[in-house]
Amino acid sequence: KHGNLDYVLEQAGSIDLFIHLGDVEGDEEYLDAVIECEKHIVRGNNDFFSRLPREEEFDIGKYHVFITHGHYYYVSMDVDTIIEEARSRNADIVMFGHTHKPYFSQKDGLTVLNPGSLSYPRQDGRKPSYMVMEIDEEGKAHYEQKYL
């Protein structure tokens, strides 16, 4: 179960921030042990006894970020509700999980993304996936969807 994450961390080398969008399933201590940088982790619908927060807001550079697992915003149906919530929070970026399927859109100043899942991918082909976000020298965000 941890093999894919271990591989990704090894390939990535140095990272400044790690974000997990829920369904940690009791692996909080493991993540604390292997992730040495700043981390933001939210509770998913399978994290029954977790004390992790349901959602978080923070800034990455000039971007205000809202993260949530997404099930409270019906992301399995569409992204309309989560977009509405992100806009009400003045977010520039909203990240969610829950569907275990990669998703990316940029519209009217809002980036909406789901990196997919390293452990339980559900998109066609079921390739484990994650996303890398980099901020360039001018402070602009760039995103890369990656597959194992």
Set out the residue ranges of the language-model regions.
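A short helix->loop->beta-strand "cap" motif at the edges of active sites that frequently abuts
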Residues: E36-E38, L110
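Active-site neighborhood of phospho(di)ester-bond hydrolases with catalytic His/Asp-centered motifs
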Residues: L17-D23, H40-N45, F66-H69, I93-H98, ...
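Beta-strand-turn-beta hairpins that frame and shape the catalytic cleft
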Residues: E57-F66, Q106-V112, M133-Y143
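Active-site environment of divalent metal-dependent phosphoester hydrolases
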Residues: K1-L5, E25-E29, N46-R51, Y73-M77, ...
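Binuclear metal-dependent phosphoesterase catalytic core
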Residues: G3-D6, E84-N90, L113-L148
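Helix-adjacent hinge/juxtasegments
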Residues: E38-E85, R89
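N-terminal active-site segment of His-dependent metallophosphoesterases
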Residues: K1-E36, D47-F48, P53-R54, R126-S129, ...
